[in-house]
């Protein structure tokens, strides 16, 4: 074969190879296209300037109720339980639980009596030490308090212990933080005083610095000096509470990360009580902590010293940047009611409570606030008259008396009725009506449309309590959270009538689970968020954003989706949120119209997905991040894109927009025209 023939043959072979490769490549592309089915649904989003409406600034917030030891033994950082010995009742001698003795009955005798110097809490503890330095155990005898299922003491941290004491003789009292059985001392200081110094009640304080860590520690008060000592109002607080305001840092931060726009407090059924004698009464929760009598919350069956009181709730709201919504008792409990003709003392109590928050420092109740260290008024624009009381005999009559009195004194305050106005108009005036829903996952998912047909006239809706409960919920399942996410998307779409919404309950101490499920789970030293908590985080940017007009087209009955636009650090985003409630993966086309071409940026766009391998998966102390959102780069951020929604998932897609680049002519001294990009 000559050289020319060889070159020709080689060229033919190369050409054949290239043609064959192209054919194979095209065939593979066809196969890929066939294996990647067309999207089952399309979300059409109108992002033009006129394509949306504002979402209320207040839409998503939180509801704090004293339930599950959410406050006492939780958010409120006080380590001592039953610090004033009042929990056992006013008849003495009384039960001092959870206090107990160090030593035995041959060396120490303790009992309560009514000798306290505080008029509202007369119970004190008398400790008769029967041994002396020779006969007492080396560590002394006395009493200890284990706190709320153990005190979390951390090495290097400081704890302020305060107590009131008196005695008939000299005292030499050791104040110690120890391990749960008292065998190891974590920190200790002495209070030494002469008989003349402690012949009358006197406040003593010590600062303890822990030299070791123990999440199940206890506080001990011990002595080897024979004689009688009276003790009252014992407090142990970490020095490093949030802003020094008494809130446990890690729990406060979990709450703050939701970015709530309001906080409803202090209940709930906690406000009502099983009986009015045990209802939360705000006046008993203000002033110096040692003067607060505390009370037994008979609905949730535990004692609170009320260190977390009326003042602290307003402080919490301010610290978290949320509008306070105060729920007060309207003369009605679960089992007894005050008739309307006799309701005025309760009305005056509500007016006084508003004055405490908003009044001038020279006003009657504003001055009480000022004495607590707060000269400036708190902000208070919302109050709720009762909780879940609409069907009670005297509610409507009582409500009108409260409404008229509050509007006369504070016409700007927005008033929330307990009666549901979503299906029928209210028969009384209100700015908002309260709506509560606890149900199964499938029911709540279907309630995505709950407010679609609600009249836009009259009061706005406040969905102040909602959650999936029952077997679908477990103790905080993925399934429950997905139904809640769909429900919230529905509230977001109906935010022209729904102005506020909050999940319930917020906190649970695992040692006293009175309600199930809850958003944030904790014990003395650890915490985690349930999937329902993480759903709340998806909606943090919705309040005050713009709801974009969107339409979901397709055959799927398991998908719910919406779109908002919002700003962060001066940048514009479109956020697509989608719930796939079904067991199969779904492809969803997202078609955004009304934007300039090529406005989306891949860099800065992201997707966030909440899902797991099993729809009933939960988080736990051993696996706190088993079901949490996972964030990644959104590589195909375009006006027309297809996204994959995993089975049983909640996804958000944040599309970063940038200003369109326009070519503008400019001129210089030359005769040629130049362009610049702006």
Curated annotation (Swiss-Prot):
Its main location: secreted. GO terms for cellular component: apoplast; plant-type vacuole; secretory vesicle. GO terms for biological process: L-arabinose metabolic process; xylan catabolic process. SUPFAM superfamilies: (Trans)glycosidases, Galactose-binding domain-like, Glycosyl hydrolase domain. Keywords: Extracellular matrix, Glycoprotein, Hydrolase, Secreted, Signal. It catalyses: Hydrolysis of terminal non-reducing alpha-L-arabinofuranoside residues in alpha-L-arabinosides. Residues 152-239 form the CBM-cenC domain. One of its GO terms (molecular function) is alpha-L-arabinofuranosidase activity. It is found in: Secreted, Extracellular space, Extracellular matrix. Its EC number is 3.2.1.55, 3.2.1.-. Expressed in roots, leaves, flowers, stems, siliques and seedlings. Observed in zones of cell proliferation, the vascular system and floral abscission zones. Expressed in the guard cells in stems, in xylem vessels and parenchyma cells surrounding the vessels, in the cambium and in the phloem, but not in the secondary xylem. InterPro entries: Alpha-L-AF_C, ASD1_cat, Galactose-bd-like_sf, Glyco_hydro_b, Glycoside_hydrolase_SF, Glycosyl_Hydrolase_51. Residues 1-33 form the signal peptide. Disruption phenotype: No visible phenotype; even in asd1 and asd2 double mutant. The keyword Signal applies. This is Alpha-L-arabinofuranosidase 1. The gene is ASD1.
């Amino acid at each position: 074969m000559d050289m020319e023939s060889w070159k020709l043959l080689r060229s033919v072979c190369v050409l054949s190879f290239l043609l064959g490769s192209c054919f194979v490549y095209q065939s593979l592309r066809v196969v890929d296209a066939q294996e990647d089915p067309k999207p089952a649904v399309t979300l059409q989003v109108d992002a033009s300037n006129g394509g949306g409406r504002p979402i209320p600034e207040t839409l998503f917030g939180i509801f704090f109720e004293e339930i599950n030891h959410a406050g006492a033994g939780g958010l409120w950082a006080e380590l001592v339980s039953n610090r004033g010995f009042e929990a056992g009742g006013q008849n003495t001698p009384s039960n001092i639980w959870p206090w107990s003795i160090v030593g035995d009955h041959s060396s120490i005798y303790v009992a309560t009596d009514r000798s306290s110097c505080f008029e509202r809490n007369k119970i004190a503890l008398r400790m008769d030490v029967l041994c002396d330095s020779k006969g007492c155990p080396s560590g002394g005898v006395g009493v200890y308090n284990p706190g709320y299922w153990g005190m979390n003491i951390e090495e290097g941290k400081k704890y302020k212990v305060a107590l009131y004491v008196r005695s008939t003789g000299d005292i030499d009292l050791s104040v110690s933080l120890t391990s749960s059985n008292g065998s190891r001392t974590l920190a200790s200081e002495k209070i030494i005083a002469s008989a003349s110094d402690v012949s009358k009640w006197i406040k003593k304080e010590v600062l303890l610095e822990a030299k070791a860590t123990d999440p199940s520690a206890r506080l001990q008060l011990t002595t080897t000096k024979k004689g009688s000592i009276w003790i009252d109002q014992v407090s142990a607080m970490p020095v490093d509470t949030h802003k020094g305001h008494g809130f446990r840092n890690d729990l406060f931060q979990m709450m703050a990360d939701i970015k709530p726009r309001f906080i409803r407090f202090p209940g709930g059924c906690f406000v009502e009580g099983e009986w009015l004698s045990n209802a939360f009464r705000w006046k008993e929760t203000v002033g110096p902590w040692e003067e607060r009598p505390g009370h037994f919350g008979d609905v949730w069956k535990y004692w609170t010293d009320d260190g977390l009181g009326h003042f602290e709730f307003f402080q919490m709201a301010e610290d978290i940047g949320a509008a306070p919504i105060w729920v007060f008792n309207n003369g009605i409990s679960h089992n007894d009611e005050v008739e309307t003709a006799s309701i005025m003392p309760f009305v005056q109590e509500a007016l006084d409570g508003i004055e405490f928050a908003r009044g001038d420092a020279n006003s009657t109740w504003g001055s009480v606030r000022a004495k607590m260290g707060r000269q400036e008024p708190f902000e208070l624009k919302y109050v709720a008259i009762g909780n879940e009381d609409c069907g009670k005999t005297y509610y409507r009559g009582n409500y009108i008396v409260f409404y008229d009195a509050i509007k006369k004194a504070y016409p700007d305050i927005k008033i929330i009725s307990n009666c549901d106005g979503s299906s029928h108009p209210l028969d009384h005036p209100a700015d908002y009506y309260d709506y509560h829903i606890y149900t199964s996952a499938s029911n709540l998912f279907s309630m995505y449309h709950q407010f679609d047909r609600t009249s836009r006239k009259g009061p706005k809706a406040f969905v102040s309590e909602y959650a999936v409960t029952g077997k679908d919920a477990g103790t905080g399942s993925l399934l429950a959270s997905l139904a809640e996410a769909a429900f919230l998307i529905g509230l977001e779409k109906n935010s022209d009538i729904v102005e506020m919404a909050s999940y319930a309950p917020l906190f649970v101490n695992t040692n006293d689970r009175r309600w199930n499920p809850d958003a944030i789970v904790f014990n003395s030293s650890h915490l985690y968020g349930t999937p329902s908590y993480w759903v709340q985080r998806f909606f943090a940017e919705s309040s005050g954003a713009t709801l974009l007009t969107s339409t979901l087209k397709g055959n799927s009955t398991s998908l719910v989706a919406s779109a908002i636009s919002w700003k962060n650090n001066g940048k514009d985003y479109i956020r697509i949120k989608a719930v796939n409630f079904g067991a199969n993966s779904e492809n969803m086309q997202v078609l955004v119209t009304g934007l300039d071409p090529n406005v989306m940026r891949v860099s800065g766009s992201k997707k966030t997905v909440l899902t797991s391998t099993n729809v009933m998966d939960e988080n736990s102390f051993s696996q706190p991040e088993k079901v949490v959102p996972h964030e990644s780069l959104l590589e195909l951020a375009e006006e027309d894109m297809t996204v994959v929604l995993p089975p049983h998932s909640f996804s958000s897609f944040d599309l970063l927009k940038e200003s369109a680049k326009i070519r503008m002519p400019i001129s210089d001294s030359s005769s040629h025209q130049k362009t610049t990009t702006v």
